[in-house]
Amino acid sequence: KTKYRIIGTHYTKHNKTFLAEHEEVVVSSNSFTYEDFLEVRYMSFMFFAVFQLSFQRWFFQFVRHLGIYPSKFFSHFFKPDRNSNWPERYISFIDTLKNAFEAELHETREDMVANAKKIFEANGNDVGDAVRLNLNYGGRLSYLENDWVKPVLLRHLNEIMNGKLSSEDRNLASLLIDLSEREQVDLKNICEKEPLNISFDVINWKKNKFMEPLHNLKMSEKLL
């Protein structure tokens, strides 16, 4: 089964003919379910958010050295146990993102073209905003969802580790989440942030592309 989606803002009218560049996307087959498609779409989003937008990059590099592949963590992140008590805004975010992934897909080419034409005419014969879900929602995740990110990441980490997460590793993971948040700058409300006490050389860790475990880079405690 396939569906259709517009590529960016590649649509216009030429000599009274409406044209729209698009993709035909395979969303299921005899060996690939629709749920598999959504799983791949979630992975694509998270890899972009972490490795292009640097969403919690310190944390994810750290847990990689705990033996947890990013794909495994991302899968847990998007499939929380709905019978457990999770932050409402977290559940709302992943549900909204899923709806956005599905809304960009159209059952037929004709539906896709009709939707693009509707947007074009509503904007006075001009294109609308580009559908850049990875960028838009990745930015939202990095800057607008901080109230739930830390407890959710730490809870998933503990669950993936089957309760065997040491207090030292939990504290370090928590510190690295705080470090990522300290790196963010609110240009509308610039204020001085409280420094972190850190006893691992994260600067050289990053410089060396996170090749070795952070535990190997112990140093005297410094303010960062």
PLM features per residue range, with description:
Residues 1-69, 195-203, 210-224:
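A structural motif corresponding to the C-terminal lobe/cap of the Radical SAM core domain
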Residues 38-147:
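C-terminal non-catalytic alpha-helical accessory regions
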Residues 113-224:
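Charge-dense, extended regions
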